[in-house]
Regions:
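A short, structured active-site edge motif that brings together acidic residues
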Residues: 76-88, 111-115, 169-172
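Short, acidic/polar
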Residues: 29-42, 90-105, 126, 151-154
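N-terminal binding-site loop/beta-alpha segment at the start of enzyme catalytic domains
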Residues: 1-78, 316-317, 321-328
Length: 328
């Protein structure tokens, strides 16, 4: 496993991390009891970055991840990242959310992120400075954001008084390359890292069948699953290198400087995912994958827009809807 630094001054993390959305999430049918085995296998494979959020299963994912890390005695050896929800309208509520996340985890996270931008009528700086307040309160060691388009990432970073945003966690994969148009170049200019969620397009780039609601309802999963050119390119490169299609898709992101955080409900798959960090793509491999996925640079729009609709939903309604659904 190789390790990279988040941002200019953030923690050193494994080139491939592990996402815990699937653990505790109703949309994935996740089982929190799997967290212990997932963390154990990940640590044995060199993975030290684990990502969760307060809305994943209404906190169940945080609780499961925290319990696993504590039971295995790994707190000082891993980087735990969590996200406070974008429905928190001010610094006071962001600090309150960070404290609640720390209680569920059983410790303060290493990296605290704002999961999505606040509603349009709330000053961006009020929310982002809440992350800085949480930092000063000892509720995290580093701060970042998630689902921020490039221009907003730049504005958010300018809001900070002393701290810096070490990362922007966005959806990024061979099936969704829109971040290359705005997020990636802006992050690079600021010295922030890209953490890539859904790096396998919810399993479509690994040849998965749609077994969960999160897959069946996702347009990008459907598009990538049916894209013969992209699937053939993945199979071709995988066969040449003697690895899996999933490892090729993750290696493509690592090669571009992103830190992918794939998720899984199967502990036996963790070593495969970790192995992607050691896959070496040739120039011909890169060209083939770039060409097969070129349509996905603009197919979903010319500006990153995940969760953009939430910017026009009042915080109270966001909170109530997520609670009623049992979390994300």
């Amino acid at each position: 496993m190789k390790y990279v630094r988040l941002g200019r001054s953030g923690p050193k993390v494994s080139a491939v991390g592990l996402g815990f959305w699937e653990v505790g999430s109703r949309s994935w049918g996740g089982d929190p009891s799997l967290a212990h085995d997932l963390v154990r296998e990940a640590h044995a494979s060199g993975i030290n970055l684990f990502d969760t959020a307060e809305v994943y299963g209404n906190g169940r994912s945080e609780e499961a991840l925290g319990a696993a890390v504590r039971k295995l005695g790994l707190r000082d050896e891993v980087v735990v990242a969590t996200k406070v929800a974008g429905f928190r309208p001010s610094g006071y509520f962001i600090v309150k959310g960070a404290a609640a996340s720390a209680r569920r985890l059983g410790f303060a996270p290493t990296l605290l992120q704002l999961h999505w931008p606040p509603p349009a009528w709330i000053p961006l700086c009020a929310a982002v400075r809440g992350l800085e307040d949480a930092l000063r309160a000892g509720l995290a060691e580093y701060i970042g954001v998630s689902n921020f388009p490039g221009d907003m990432l730049e504005r958010a970073n300018a809001c900070l008084r002393k701290a810096e945003l070490v990362s922007d966690q966005v959806e990024y994969s061979l099936a969704y390359r829109t971040p290359e148009l705005d997020v990636v170049p802006r992050a690079r200019s600021l010295g922030a890292s890209i953490i890539a969620y859904s790096p396998l397009a919810k399993g479509a780039l690994a040849g998965a069948r749609p077994s969960a609601a999160a897959q069946r309802l996702d347009r990008r999963f459907s598009a990538a699953s049916r894209d013969g050119d992209l699937q053939e390119a993945l199979r071709s490169v995988a066969a040449r290198l003697g690895v899996t299609a999933a490892q090729v898709a993750l290696a493509w992101l690592v090669d571009r400087g992103a830190v992918p955080i794939p998720g899984t409900r199967r502990p036996e798959r963790v070593r495969e995912l970790a192995g992607a960090a050691d896959v070496k793509l040739s120039e011909a491999d890169r060209e083939l994958l770039d060409r097969a996925s070129a349509k996905y640079v603009t197919a979903w729009g010319r500006k990153y827009g995940n969760l953009r609709a939430l910017r026009y939903v009042p915080c109270g309604l966001q909170y109530a809807a997520i609670k009623l659904m049992g979390g994300a």
